[in-house]
A protein has these predicted regions:
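A structural signal for short loop-to-beta-strand junctions that line the ligand-binding cleft
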Residues: 83, 90-93, 123-168, 347-354, ...
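Long, aromatic- and glycine/proline-rich binding clefts that accommodate carbohydrate-like moieties
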Residues: 139-143, 333-342, 392-448, 473, ...
Length: 479
């Protein structure tokens, strides 16, 4: 994982920010050693965080604070965190949590409510008020969009379009695309920003090549595929992309904000939702054959793109750092980034609703007062202007408006131009304790549709019936 680039430049900036934010570092007569144990998924954003902490953090209390992190592979992360929490071992003071886990782990007594910490700290309150509401609501609130806060954003994330400039901007490909579709093949990031799903589908069809076919002026060394997005059975790897299609088509998933009167049946399987799922499924014909096996998750599409087997990939920003690193990517110098495609409305504008990625920090309920004080100071440092800029300079993202609206933010990474407009289109799925049952059954049903075993209507009828029954039993839907 590459954590290179501009970190040394920002050391002084971070130090200055700490002094400004906290009024300097106290030096008590007897400094204590405080260890904060944290569980995190192992990927670039958390590695960058640890690197910044090791190089720059000094506790305002004057204590010697150590951040002891367990880096856990993403595929195992939920299982291992859940096992630790339910075992009663109380190993972690903090964790980076997926937003969907909030309800289950809050109701089980593991995640601490933080309203009192926010109310007691004007600086922290001001920082959160400077945060875009979409990620703040997604990462912090339970119930979703309530005033009950449980998390601080660690790495906000959204889906964007990764594409191969050497392929789509090639003169021969440009000429042949115009001849076939009577329209220009988008090339520049600005042109790609205006790509709707219809053009995306055409590009997917156009760039399907077999080994030996001409591709950008030379024979393809391997089979080459037009497009990819998440369509895997594991965890939430089809649900998130499908949610975006449903919202763009004017449909909805079951909305916990409408409880207890909002139903699943008639909403989850509405005509708009069925049309959206059909749309999602139609595009899979221009994807690598692994899509028909249930194995095309976010990590697999990322791998395929970095191996040079895709023209375009709809992927979370959190994986982009490896794409521009020549040590991990064959296309590091042949890639550009644009906003995710959308559905073009009658007014000609693109509707880009999408399921937000990213994760918050959470505090465990058993953390003592001394640990909580150090955690809050750590979080304030993390969300401070200097640290957020340093994180962005190293490949991360910030949900703080005054940070990402700073003109220099655009210079840190080529995908940052997509960030501010993309945040406007983010929604989240369920935060309720029953999320896992909802997710597992939905993933199973979507996999049947993706692999060609049942149609879109049957799939959504099955999901709607299951959700209606489960949510009634749980008291989230009342007659």
């Amino acid at each position: 994982m590459s954590c290179k680039t501009k970190l040394p430049i920002w050391t002084a900036v971070v130090a200055t920010a700490i002094a400004l934010n906290f009024g300097g570092v106290a030096t008590p007569a007897l400094a204590e050693e405080v260890v904060l144990h944290m569980a995190v998924p192992d990927w670039p954003p958390t590695r960058i965080m640890k690197d910044l902490f090791n190089k720059n953090y000094k506790a305002p209390s004057g204590n010697h604070v150590k951040l002891d992190i367990d880096f856990i592979p993403w595929p195992d992360y939920y299982t291992r965190l859940n096992t630790s929490l339910t075992s009663g071992e109380k190993k972690y003071n903090m964790a980076v949590s997926d937003s969907q886990w909030l309800g289950a782990f809050i109701e089980a007594g593991y995640y601490r409510k933080i309203n009192d910490l926010i109310d007691a700290d004007p600086g922290l309150k001001a920082t959160l008020s400077d945060m875009h509401p979409n990620p703040l609501q997604a990462y912090a609130t339970y119930p979703y969009k309530s005033e009950n806060y449980y998390g601080f954003p660690q790495m906000p994330d959204i889906l964007i379009n990764y594409y191969r400039t050497d392929i789509v901007c090639n003169e021969d490909e440009q000429k042949n695309f115009r001849a076939k579709y009577n329209q220009k093949l988008p090339c520049t990031p600005e042109e790609m920003d205006d790509v709707d799903w219809d053009t995306f589908e055409k590009m997917g069809e156009f760039f399907m090549r077999q080994k030996g076919d001409m591709l950008a002026g030379k024979p393809a060394g391997d089979d080459f595929y037009g497009i990819a997005y998440q369509a895997g059975r594991a965890y939430n790897n089809s649900t998130r992309q499908i949610n975006g299609f449903i919202w763009q088509h004017g449909g909805n998933i079951w909305d916990e904000a409408q409880a207890p009167t909002g139903h699943a049946e008639g909403v989850v399987n509405s005509p708009e939702a069925v049309k959206a799922l059909d749309h999602y499924l139609r595009l899979t014909k221009y994807m690598p054959p692994i899509v028909k096996t249930g194995g095309m998750d976010a990590l697999k599409t990322d791998e395929l793109f970095r191996e040079g087997k895709l023209a375009m990939n709809i992927e979370y920003i959190g994986l982009a750092e490896n794409t521009i690193n020549p040590e991990t990517s064959k296309v590091a110098h042949k890639v550009a980034f644009a906003q995710m495609p959308g559905l073009r409305g009658a007014d000609g504008k693109l509707v880009r609703w999408s399921n937000i990625g990213g994760q918050p920090f959470v505090i465990m309920t058993w953390s003592d007062d001394k640990q909580i004080k150090e955690i809050v100071d750590f979080v304030k440092w993390w969300l401070s202007t200097g640290t957020q800029h340093a994180f962005a300079a190293a490949g991360g993202q910030s949900a703080i408006k005054s940070v990402y609206n700073d003109p220099k933010y655009l210079d840190y990474r080529p995908w940052n131009r997509t960030w501010a407009p993309g945040l406007e289109w983010q929604k989240d799925a369920w935060h309720i304790p029953e999320f896992f049952e909802l997710l597992a059954q939905g993933q199973e049903q979507y996999d049947l549709a993706i692999t060609g075993k049942q149609d879109a209507k049957t799939t959504l009828d099955n999901i709607a019936a299951f959700q209606e029954r489960l949510l009634k039993e749980a008291g989230h839907i009342q007659e």
